[in-house]
Amino acid sequence: MENPIVYSPVDAGKIISDTAANLMKSAATSGWAKVKKYFKDFSAEESIEIGTAFNDYIRVTQERNSKIKTLIYRRVPKDIYSFYECVGLRLEGKVIKTSNVSDVLKIGKKILVTGTGGIGKSILMKHLFLSTIKETEYIPVLLELRKFNGMENKDISIYRAVYQTLSDNGFTLADEYYKYSLEKGGYIILLDGFDEVNRDKLKKVQEEIKSFSDKFEKNTYIISSRPTEMFIGWNDFVETSVMPLSKKQALSLVNKIEFDESAKRAFYTELSRTLYDKYTSFASNPLLLTIMLLTFSNHASIPENLNEFYEEAFTTLFNMHDATKDCY
């Protein structure tokens, strides 16, 4: 019989400060210098001006994507690396590590990341965005596809949406420079939540993704979604699936979460002894694992009857998750 893993509190503050410091140092020391090659020659004055704008874009988007609210952290956004567990991607029997975006980029230029609700797709996309800044010489752009739900079909354009994302965050380019950088393959474009696009917009968004990625094929495209049969027709995209949390990862996640220590310690112990093995489909999903922790803290146990667990937790907490869907 496997011995329970001993609960050991994590210094979340040190994790945050170390990770943030490394990211900021990487961005500050490289920045414009490493992506300038994707743009036409500027005058010295233009290069300084646009370089400053690019560094502002990296600073603003890095800060925005490094913190989120969750079911646990509902009021104050938390640094994702204070609790995030890097999950693997399954591809034809192989496991692709995601701790460094460079390993993901080896898959190809067009990648689908699929997984069930709560598995952590959106937070993975944020992690890949941040890893792009730190580890590569590409310009990352993260776009939530649900933003198209408020548009008329005729106004939906990936080309304009990517440009708007750059511009809204301080990196405004003349169209000729923007188009040139796309043609040169200067971007990693992360399109999050294809499954969240309304049905009446879905065909148009699909057409936009296909035409844009075909026209500017030198860039890398990573699209997240729940599984859908629509992807069967995306012949030049490689579909990967997000792997569930291992027992070790589930325990690590619980250990990192800021929560009532006595309740967390008791849950950690039970998760190690029996709960993960008994309820693997729940405990290996970050969102459901969080719900298990909340339910356990309220009742000092997990109901034997899973229907009771659903009734107690799912309706309320999944509605809450819709409001904070970037995370778990």
Question: Language-model segments: what does each one mean?
Answer:
Residues 3-326:
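P-loop NTPase signaling cores
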